[in-house]
Amino acid sequence: MILVRNIRLPLSAGEPQAFEKALHAARIPRGKVQHLGVAKLSVDARHGQPKLVYTVAVTLKEPAEEAAFAARCGDASLQQKVDFSVQNGIQPLAHRPVVCGLGPAGLFAALLLARQGYQPIVLERGPALDERVKAVEHFSATGELDVNANIQFGEGGAGTFSDGKLTTRIGDELCGFVTEVFLQHGAPEEIAWKQKPHVGTDLLRGVITSIRKEIEALGGEVHFNTALTGFEQKNGQLTGIFTTNGTFACEALVFAVGHSARDTCGMLMDGGLQLECKPFSVGFRAEHLQSEIEKSLYHEAAGHPALPRGEYQLSQHVGERCVYTFCMCPGGQVVASASEEGRVVTNGMSFHARNGKNANAAVVVSVGGKDFADDPRRAIAFQRELEARAYAAGRSAGEYAAPAENIQSFLEGRGQLNIGRVQPTYDRGVAAADLGALLPQELAETLRAGLRAYERKIAGYTAPEAILTGLETRTSSPVRLKREENFECTQLAGLYPCGEGAGYAGGIMSAAVDGLRVARAIISRYAPAEG
């Protein structure tokens, strides 16, 4: 297959024009073509006149001719499909492998193990997705929190209640395998070619359930409402685990508990395993009118049907720290994401259509080990303290209401909330608060400097009607459980730290890829348990 890149067209053009321009650029006669398709589509909104930028995939009737044609065009290259395969190992497993956590990392680790005949046992502290959705909706309506069934815990992990983004910077060939699995299980076809693919929380739920059912159909077992509580080991080798629903003998455990399993991290440290601090970030969730964001990004072309919903990604270095936007949700809403009683956490979510009035994104500042004397317990305690402050600051508006403030007020330290055209979407309600007072002064001032810089990049970002809701604290895990090159824990053989909670991923795609890497390491070493 030949990929012809950088096919730039006006918004009024479509696929036929892209195909013709690609063939002309690569000097490929139409009669030699077997198939034409869109491999990637993005928008270049620079210079005030947005352009569609296509990468066109060309398959010739005679594959042997593709290399010669690809060499004729500087924007063309030959691409060979890389099939992902793994060979089963020979060291016998006495027991079936166990996967702890059914977020993206655990889900894809379990899927690969199941497809290779290992019949994994999967443990998830939260409920199945249908029950989880009911618990989330109940919390949104009443403020009654289930600490094991919420936006953080349950089938699918935290990413289930998000925008369903599949973007990543890791550049791993396994990303293609993840996309293929999503497509096999009902994700929209556009995720294969959009520059910034997303599934949306509404469609993602069905995809996750379908993948889990494939695991079960291949002999895997899924135990919901089952939390990991301890380990059993002998001479530095894992021999079994303790859970809230009994014990499981195992010598291979995929530890993929997610970034909010603080009690599990505490159990590891209490049991003698050493965790290390890793960088994470804290801040707020910013809301603007989606239409205003698109006017700033697309100018006169805003609203054109060929354009996707406008989204942005901003960053600004302020001294030794970085202020950046995270998990931007066009046409989305801010959701109550607490998983511990008496603490408020924000996150963003949007449906596939992204048709809400508001745009939202986390605006956060980086923190790291030096802020906590490289003590992982202090890093976790810092998150908890901020969330407790947010709970107290918002409580006047109801249980798990969130503190909020206009961006201009935050910049000036006034603690005021005037609701105009931008209606806050946080589902438990908001209360006016001085958000700067909830953070250490240095972090608050750094965020202010970052926001002022954003105004120079997106006009109107700090407009008086724009709103901040807080606090955003779960951007990633604050800790890492170290592992060797073979993906085993450095301190306990048979334990395989995996995904975002263990400190090795950030987002759905990278977590899924890490799950595949860990599963591949287990498969390459071991043969399936007999019986």
Where do the protein language model's features map onto the residues?
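Residues forming the flavin
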Residues: M1-P50, V56-F161, K165-H185, E189-G531
